[in-house]
Amino acid sequence: MPRKKQTSPKEVTPALLKFREKRKWQINYRRYVLEESPCPFYAPYFGLDIKNLRQWFEYQFTGDLRWDNFGKKWQFDHVIPVTYFDFANEEELKMCWNFTNIRVEKFQLNKDRGNRLDVLNAKNYFKELLEKTNYAVCLKLLSKIDEIEVSDFVNTEAQQ
């Protein structure tokens, strides 16, 4: 019987590398929050220790949302989606994975938000948080939204 040919490994493209990097961060974030597993490398990017980060999410629980139904009834959601951040830039990583940029999102049927940024809601959210807390990361995230808006405007103009 002839040997089965091995399939060649996936070609390593910049997009694949970016996907793998994002996935690595997502996995470590879940381990940190859900499994309460300390991670000295990633923890500084999250902005809070495990106990306080879990409380941050618990404040957002509504109705029947609980830790034991993560992945079934709710998930973590980035206010500014991950795709807008450059993982090669340390400051961008700190903004992307900061607790203020991640919230509880209840699963909804037929919802397909994808990687779109709801600019108005995101701006209002970070402005309100900045006013209440004076937390500097909120100001940086507001600047990031402005940067995204300018970039989207330039791209739209270039297409016309």
Give residue ranges: language-model regions.
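Extended charged
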Residues: 1-12, 16, 71, 123-160
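Histidine-centered catalytic micro-motifs used for acid/base chemistry in nuclease
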Residues: 56-90, 102-107
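General structural signal for secondary-structure boundaries
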Residues: 48-49, 61, 91, 106-107, ...
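Short Cys/His-centered divalent metal-binding micro-motifs
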Residues: 98-130
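A generic "cationic amphipathic patch" detector
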Residues: 40, 70, 89, 115-119
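Immediate flanking context of iron-sulfur cluster ligation sites
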Residues: 91-97
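Contiguous alpha-helical segments
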Residues: 1-70, 75
